[in-house]
Amino acid sequence: GYSLNAIIDYKHPLDIFAHLIVGAEGTLAFFSDVVLDTIDDPPLKTMGLVLFDSVASSMAALPVLVNEGADAVEMLDDASLRTAQYLENPPYDHLQILDNSAALLFEFQKHQVNEIEHLTQSIPHALTLMGGRLPLGMISNDAQRLQLWNIRKGLYPTVGSMRKKGTSVITEDLCYDYRDLPKVVSELKLICQQWQYDDAVIFGHAKDGNLHFAASMDLNSIDGEKRFEGLLNDMAKLTVGKFDGSLKAEHGTGRNMAPFVEYEWGGDLYNIMWKIKNLADPNSILNPDVLLTKDNKTHVKNLKKMPLVSDEVDLCVECGFCEPVCPSKEITMTPRQRIVVQREIAGGYADPSVLDAFQYDGIETCATDGLCEIACPVNINTGTFVKWFRQKNESTIGKLISGWAANHFSFIQFLARGGLSMGKATQKILGGPALKVITRYTNKIGLSPQWNEKLPYASKPLLTIKENHGAQWVYFFG
């Protein structure tokens, strides 16, 4: 729902409205420009992962970390901890994780060395007294810290990678009094089991009482849609009805929780929200049925399917971790966008114009360098998929030519050197601008590439060493 506290926190109508817009998810207006303040990033950090036999014992240890000023405390249930088996170098043995156990992943950020030294001595001792086990102790090394954080960071995509192909992934965001978390986690697990979400993992920001859970779901059948609806209904009853919690903490309400806003806030506050909406957007043009809705079934309508595309990319959960490293992200598409468009095409949802545009945007501009695989939590190389696409669309003549060229590359190099030498010689006679104009036309009919004055001179052929003196190793120093 809307952040109604803005009505009592501010007096000027513009201030009130501006603060309502911030959490309104585009249903009242939008900000075209935002200035953000930066926050302090202390240079010294230390962290640890402490394992407990139960969620209750992990929560009992939470005040120790909070009172010492922990900047982050994450809770991981037993299913979350077992996902470490998919890491390249897991920090602990996942086979030793007991049922119903839990862990706290915590970090301290400081400016002084003596503060870090104090914490690395006092925290392990205090947590051990409360039944905790720190398999790695306290860690200050950046590379090791990143590896620990990858357990938490990769939970959502890891669940996605283990799911059956063609299914989707749901992640929800709930908030409770942190003292209720042991009971909440236990009952959430029962709800997931009841609705056959057996791969669900539960984790969250422990000191804030903020829980997330992620699970795979099959939306390709009526039964799958009913199980999804049942899960959300029971989750709402547990959160609001039993524990007086909130159905949203840091994620947006969206369409998934819109039918439950009145249930959480009551009729009076819900009516105020609708009055605000009707004043700002009387025709309901802005994001209809998002955050507020009169359709109590909107969360189970127009559900997004996951059509099968290719074994290379079907496990993609569209998390977007690949996007920052993609060379073509500022030009055409990212790996995630390439996969999403292919799913739209496979499902028959795409406009015909998309098919034409995808040839250049999706296929021709992909660098196929595999950087996306390095960033991807489930090791998807979209470039491999694009190579398959290119091969599928290649003509027989094209395959023969490329195959011959690959097997006669020294001759291709000879031709390239000759072409550069001829181009440079012609440029001296005709001039660079004239040659560029001529080759622009020859390029259009496929006779030559377009000339560029900045092309280098042809390099000399590398010397070939024919004698073998039996050296086992050859070192190169740049």
Placement of each model-derived feature along the sequence:
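Iron-sulfur-cluster electron-transfer modules
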Residues: 161-165, 351-478
